[in-house]
Design a protein with these regions (language model features):
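Aromatic "clamp/platform" in nucleotide-sugar-dependent glycosyltransferases that forms part
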Residues: 707
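Conserved donor-binding/catalytic core segment of Leloir-type glycosyltransferases
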Residues: 428, 623-639, 645-649
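Nucleotide-activated donor-binding/catalytic signature segment of Leloir-type glycosyltransferases, i.e.
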Residues: 670-690
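An N-terminally biased module of ancient metal coordination in phosphate/nucleic-acid-related enzymes
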Residues: 1-86, 209
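Short hydrophobic beta-strand element within catalytic cores of glycosyltransferases
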Residues: 724-727
Length: 802
């Protein structure tokens, strides 16, 4: 049997009334594809028949009506009169007089469909799940199942989630369902067997790039009339590829490029020759490929010495410079050489956008305070311009996720579908994964818990390409990084925005959890909002407190609070590690009902007094006849370590038999070591595994003076190891011990309070021993089920674990 094909949903330059506001504002038509070009491309791509389905117009189809194997069609915007819902109905193989009659009836879809059946006009409902004006609902879909006998189940601009659902929807119908819907809506269905629907496909191409990407196929119908009859009889099927955000975005770019060339011609190409070369390579729909002199000029410019020093350059010059560097990057070009057009365009656009956004964001962050308001405004405005240039992707990702709520409602309204819910997949966004801090430790434990419980969890982060690959972690290569002055070893990596968005779309994540409010976390929030994905977050770190501690600047502290409250208020729920943190956030304006406790504890089998080794600290030069005070964590000022140095030296000077052990590292280490010169102390750097466990258990007491920690895993680890703990009365650690039972609480910021607390224990060995035992018992008694510790983040109660 021979098959015959046609793209039954494709647009030409006669689709000139765009639906998007920005395109209407600048009088940009929906398509620049000439009918003759469309015809030629469709035939070259294997289409046996060609039609054009412009919006409410047959002018494009009329232009090629004299060519072989063509027929006149149109995409009609029809209205459900009861609520004004717009739907698109494609009418096939019509006459001019029929088109005029259809246009007169389209304000009432019932009257229009009755006319189509009376005239025996083949027609189908295009992209049935796409809401044109926000009024599409289950009732309209149910009525459409009665009105239409043929449905577009493969639209070349729509993602598989919608195309596939549409196919399952119309395939699940039976006589009982149709009868029930007919009774419910008092509407007589069309067709002899209205539960058996015809299925077609079309590219829905507007930019000329994806003509025939999706199409309709029938068997043994070598004539137009035979092809149309096969569709009427339900003997057709949809073929080709589904679409998605990239297809939609690149169609918009194709239209924009044609608009640019039409309005500006060659006036601007001289200023940006490399950008023009890229655009022409991907989007030029005609035969014009640039003159010989243009190619010679481009070759000469391309081979001149290049530089990434953009000082003093305009935006256009920087953009063209980056395009030139890209065109000269043979490794990059080779990597995308065999990719399809969508992947090539996306890779190029993403790379250019990343470089430009990073450049201007870096400039904004490094502007001096006296740069002036307009300099800040200009730089911020340029960042906005770059986002505007890549807004077709934002628009496409957003539109490809509209309708998910409708799908959920339809699965309830039509249980006959036996719709299988998508597997829950969580993407956890974090700016830190490689450190020894509490956030990184928690995330690594989450990965392990998720794996053991059969939960699909992927941690999203950004970093250097050379960093080690960790199972369960998707590390995107950082476009660049911002180094914080007070944290020289702590970088904020700038993630590749579009690449991360595309990954989330491609993998089909159903939930996003944000662990940090940095650049990666902010991108996670943007994606969640753009793609209508449920989002939650964890408040791990008291950023405003850190800002205050590091800068002593009240304005910056308030700015940090404003950002944090805005950031977390965008989420459906926020997990907080302590009651104190919850009250602090509530007082700053975060709604109480959004906050939930984050249950965390410590593995008491890993951290245990049994790991004690009397020679552990003695072999490191401390502990010889002295009581070992231990601190574990980041060595930085905001941890209260200046106060610890002052208290420790005062105690030693007064004759106290103590030594100080520091496990950890950070920007304050060198200065702290200098200040402790001549005193019994030992800095080990970061320890892990058994060495860390023995370091805890082999000390005598644990001192944690920080007032900025929201939780404090180390306080639990110390108590599990049998150490009494000394903590401040501010922050989360205070809630992880019992004052007077497992340790002592002192007033935050008080050197005297810390001195008195240490002295109370070292002068009463029996008390110190009793508190250490109480601390161990406390962690054993209060430890939750280890399997349930991370349920809140992983939503394990909602998963069917394997």
């Amino acid at each position: 049997m021979n098959s015959y094909k046609a793209d039954l949903h494709v647009h030409s330059s006669h689709s000139n009334k765009p639906t998007y506001w920005a395109m209407r504002k600048f009088s940009v038509p929906e398509s620049y594809t000439s009918p003759k070009h469309l015809y030629r491309i469709a035939r070259e791509r294997g289409m046996d028949f060609v039609t054009i389905t412009d919006h409410n117009s047959i002018n494009g189809a009329m232009e090629i009506a004299h060519l072989p194997n063509t027929f006149i069609s149109a995409e009609i915007t029809a209205h459900f009169p009861e609520n004004g819902c717009k739907v698109h109905v494609v009418v096939l193989h019509i006459s001019e007089s029929q088109f005029q009659a259809i246009m007169e009836l389209r304000k009432n879809v019932y009257e229009m469909v009755a006319y189509l059946h009376a005239e025996k006009i083949s027609h189908f409902l295009a992209h049935p799940l796409y809401a044109q004006n926000g009024k599409l609902n289950c009732e309209i879909i149910e009525k459409s199942l009665l009105l239409f006998t043929t449905f577009e189940i493969k639209n070349g601009c729509r993602a598989h989630r919608f195309n596939g659902f549409t196919k399952r929807l119309v395939s699940s119908l039976n006589e009982n369902v149709i009868n029930r819907l007919a009774d419910t809506h008092n509407l007589q269905p069309y067709g002899c067997t209205p539960w058996i629907k015809g299925m077609v496909g079309g590219s829905d191409d507007h930019g000329g790039l994806f003509i025939a990407r999706a199409h309709t196929t029938v068997y043994d119908t070598p004539t137009v009339d035979g092809f149309i009859d096969a569709i009427k009889n339900g003997d057709s099927w949809a073929d080709g590829d589904d679409g998605g955000p990239l297809t939609m975005a690149h169609s918009l770019y194709g239209v924009a490029h044609s608009f640019y060339r039409e309005r500006l011609g060659q006036r601007r190409s001289g200023a940006t020759p490399f950008v023009s070369a890229l655009l022409d390579r991907f989007f030029n729909l005609g035969e014009e490929k640039g003159s010989f002199l243009d190619k010679v000029r481009l070759f000469i410019l391309k081979n001149l010495p290049a530089s990434r020093n953009h000082t003093g350059k305009s935006f256009e010059e920087i953009l063209d410079s980056e395009a030139r560097l890209l065109l000269s990057d043979t490794a990059f070009l080779e990597a995308i050489r065999h990719a399809d057009s969508n992947r090539k365009i996306f890779a190029v656009t993403s790379r250019l956008a990343n470089r430009l956004i990073f450049h201007y964001t870096s400039r904004l962050m490094t502007l001096p305070y006296n740069a002036g308001f307009f300099e800040y405004l200009s730089t911020a405005g340029t960042i906005g311009l770059v986002h505007t240039l890549i807004s077709p992707y934002y628009l496409a990702f957003h539109h490809q996720h509209k309708g998910k709520e409708l799908i959920r409602n339809l699965t309830i309204a039509l249980p006959e579908m036996h719709h299988k819910e998508a597997v829950e997949k969580t993407a956890l966004f974090t700016d830190t994964i490689d450190g020894i801090n509490g956030v990184a430790i928690t995330i690594k434990r989450l990965i392990s818990t998720a794996k053991s419980r059969g939960v699909e969890l992927t941690v999203i982060t950004a970093g250097d390409e050379g960093e080690a690959t960790v199972e369960g972690v998707k590390r995107f290569p950082s476009v660049g990084d911002f180094v914080l002055p007070e944290y020289p070893e702590l970088k904020l990596n700038f993630p590749p925005i579009l690449d991360v968005m595309n990954f989330i779309e491609r993998e089909g994540f159903t939930r996003i959890h944000i662990s940090t409010p940095g650049t990666v976390g902010l991108l996670g929030l943007l994606i969640a909002r753009m793609m209508n994905i449920p989002v939650a977050g964890t408040y791990h770190t008291d950023i405003p407190q850190y800002v205050r501690s590091l800068t002593n600047d009240e304005f910056l502290e308030q700015a940090a609070w404003s950002y944090m409250i805005w950031f977390y208020s965008q989420m459906e729920e926020v997990l907080v590690p302590s009651v104190g943190t919850r009250e602090q956030l509530r007082s700053r304006g975060l709604p109480t009902e959004r906050m939930k406790p984050l249950p965390r504890w410590v593995d008491t089998e890993v951290y245990s007094p049994e790991m004690r080794n009397p020679s552990f600290w003695k072999s490191r030069g401390v502990g010889l006849g002295r009581i070992v005070l231990l601190y574990v964590g980041r060595v930085s000022r905001e941890k209260g370590l200046e106060m610890l140095v002052a208290a420790f030296t005062e105690l030693v000077d007064s004759g106290a038999p103590i030594a100080l052990a520091i496990i950890g590292d950070g920007p304050y280490r060198q200065e702290m070591e200098t200040n402790l010169t001549g005193y019994p102390n030992q800095f080990t750097g970061y320890l892990t595994g058994e060495q860390l466990q023995r370091g805890y258990a082999s000390a005598d007491m644990f001192v944690f003076p920080s007032a900025t920690d929201t939780f404090g895993n180390v306080v639990l680890e110390a108590q599990a190891s049998g150490l009494p703990v000394i903590v401040s009365d501010e922050g989360g650690p205070r809630e992880l011990m019992r004052d007077g039972e497992t340790g002592i609480v002192f007033r935050a910021g008080s050197v005297k309070g810390l001195v008195d607390a240490v002295r109370l224990l070292i002068t009463d060995p029996e008390r110190m021993s009793r508190m250490g035992q109480n601390a161990r018992d406390f962690t054993l008694t209060n430890a939750p089920d280890i399997n349930e510790t991370y349920n809140t983040i992983l939503h394990l109660d909602k998963h069917n674990t394997r």
